[in-house]
Amino acid sequence: PFFRNFLQTFDKSKYKNIGMIHLHTNATLWTEQMWESMSNVHDLVKSIEISIDAGTKKTYEKVRRNGDWDMLMKNLEYINTIKTLENVKLSFVIQDDNYKEMELFENLKHKLNNIPRVRTHYYKLLDWGVMKNFEEKAVWKSNHKNFAEFKSIWKNFEKIINTETTTHNLVGVL
């Protein structure tokens, strides 16, 4: 709420040196009404990252607390109409619940075909000290029960992706 309120009341005269704003969002609240409430920053918002972490409704609603896949898809359609956006990154935190959906997630780029540059990025799940079941979820770790399957899926996935628009932080892991 703080950042939303900040953007809704943003006064360019107070921040004359800001030439661009990058937003990181899950896009569940990114409706036309919400975007219009921030009209004073439209020309500054050139880049956004949208955390999705799934390729299907079922998984999204499992890994995203209070996730609404249908609302997300509707909001992605709206985001695709925003003329000032130059860069959109869709992000996916790899975990035991979603690693089989990477290819489906990759296809979400096509929903943003009006944006000049759309990328996907795959992050390995990290332990920030608050997740009780980290070891159970961290499928990218070599001691995970599903690591061999994940590694095989990842190796096949790497063969079909465009490395100019798809990046990851799994270097040194596989």
Regions picked out by a protein language model, each given a short descriptive name:
Residues 31-35:
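Structural motif corresponding to alpha-helix initiation and N-cap regions
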Residues 4-8, 13, 17-18, 36-174:
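Radical SAM enzyme [4Fe-4S]-AdoMet core and its adjacent flexible, acidic
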Residues 26-29:
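Short beta-strand->alpha-helix junction loop in the catalytic core
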